[in-house]
């Protein structure tokens, strides 16, 4: 006798998240926005490439703004009211992504820059000659 097949619904929409952490990783080529709960479980994510920007358009500030808005739109449906923001990377989309997060209506407890800074670690890549 086979077991009855259980129907697995979408658990993503069931969860209510009052507080979360928004991680913005802004590299020179792309901007990735990940939203987690306070334990670190990923709730939603978006990137400039996933929003439809390809090639050099991914590194623009407008692409970062679109990625931040897409990531936050899903968590607003899940009831997130407060958030912390962790920004890392030197990319051109970091300020625009933060501006889009501020405009979204989520109360921000703090904004922290977590860009890794070497204490004279690895040698940096050579300068480009264009």
Curated annotation (Swiss-Prot):
Keyword Isomerase: no
Any single GO CC term annotated in Swiss-Prot or TrEMBL for this entry: chloroplast
Pfam families recorded: Ribosomal_S11
Keywords for this protein: Chloroplast, Plastid, Ribonucleoprotein, Ribosomal protein, RNA-binding, rRNA-binding
Main location: plastid
GO biological process terms on file: translation
Subcellular location per the Swiss-Prot or TrEMBL entry: Plastid, Chloroplast
Gene3D superfamilies for this protein: Ribosomal protein S11 (3.30.420.80)
InterPro entries the UniProt entry points to: Ribosomal_uS11, Ribosomal_uS11_bac-type, Ribosomal_uS11_CS, Ribosomal_uS11_sf
GO molecular function: rRNA binding; structural constituent of ribosome
Superkingdom classification of source: Eukaryota
Record carries keyword Plastid: yes
Listed SUPFAM superfamilies: Translational machinery components
Similarity-based family: Belongs to the universal ribosomal protein uS11 family.
Subunit: Part of the 30S ribosomal subunit.
NCBIfam families: PRK05309.1, uS11_bact
Name listed for the protein in its UniProt record: Small ribosomal subunit protein uS11c
Source species of the chain: Cycas taitungensis
Gene name in the database record: rps11
